[in-house]
């Protein structure tokens, strides 16, 4: 069976650019077929109204919607539309989504909340395209190397397995620091500690950017606030890299590729095949 997955990207968080790639890292997985639609950087209700219905054309076995802040007007409208569609749907969002878990339960939606996927410092005085790309590259590094992306991979792979068995169970997952580093399976305690610190820092970045973007009006105050958040995520990325380097030195990096039939396999010894 080939499981058909529809992915809707509206706006951007650090998980968005790699979401579909996490499911098929070598573009040779035989048991899934993915279609992605999106609205670019914007996620207003008018873009949502246009984009979300398009996924119905694919006749997907399940749909994943990813955006910042599932409680914002656009993503809230997307949740309404998806709850009315006759297809299982999963919402992936950042920390503000924690406050909408009950609503998503009532709407019959699954969810994955990536708590360490921080909002960007969206002030014009700081954020040009280069700064935007640099920030997102740091976030991607943190989420990849701390184990957060593996939680996303494992969760969606579980949904795929459910679809193959004819019994999809929608996930209810919040990716905390503990859940992320557990998935990374660090064997060196110092590596684990560095990864924990990196993920905690990423969560703090969201708090700082919230203050700089929405709670501070004076330009001479909000510019250094959002700039400091970007400096913090840069340091978090360096810590995450250090964690992985410690695991490399011990030849204990856990890898979980997809096998020839689409199943998840694993290995730690670099020179051995995954099983």
Question: Which residues are covered by each model-predicted region?
Answer:
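Anaerobic metallocofactor- and corrinoid-dependent redox/one-carbon enzyme cores
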Residues: 1-60, 67-73, 77-275
């Amino acid at each position: 069976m080939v499981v058909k997955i529809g992915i809707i990207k509206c706006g951007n968080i650090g998980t968005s650019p790699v979401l579909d790639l996490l499911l098929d890292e070598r573009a040779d997985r035989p048991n899934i077929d993915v279609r992605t639609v999106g609205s670019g950087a914007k996620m207003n209700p008018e873009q949502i109204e246009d984009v979300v219905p398009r996924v119905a054309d694919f006749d997907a076995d399940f749909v994943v919607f990813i955006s910042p802040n599932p409680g914002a007007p656009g993503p809230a409208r997307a949740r309404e539309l998806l709850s009315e569609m006759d297809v299982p749907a999963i919402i992936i969002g950042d920390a503000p989504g924690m406050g909408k878990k009950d609503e998503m339960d009532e709407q019959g939606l699954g969810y994955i909340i990536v708590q360490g996927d921080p909002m960007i410092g969206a002030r014009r005085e700081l954020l040009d395209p280069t700064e935007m790309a640099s920030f997102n590259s740091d976030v991607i590094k943190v989420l990849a190397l701390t184990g957060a992306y593996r939680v996303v991979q494992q969760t969606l792979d579980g949904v795929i397995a459910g679809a193959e068995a004819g019994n999809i169970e929608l996930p209810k997952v919040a990716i905390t620091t503990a859940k992320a580093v557990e998935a990374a399976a660090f064997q060196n305690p110092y590596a684990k500690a560095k990864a924990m610190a990196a993920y905690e820092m990423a969560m703090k970045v969201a708090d700082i950017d919230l203050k700089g973007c929405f709670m501070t009006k004076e330009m001479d105050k909000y510019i250094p606030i959002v700039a400091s958040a970007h400096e913090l995520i840069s340091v978090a990325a360096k810590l995450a890299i250090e964690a992985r380097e410690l695991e490399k030195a011990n030849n204990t990096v856990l890898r979980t590729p997809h096998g020839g039939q689409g199943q998840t396999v694993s290995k730690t010894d670099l020179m051995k095949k995954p099983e």
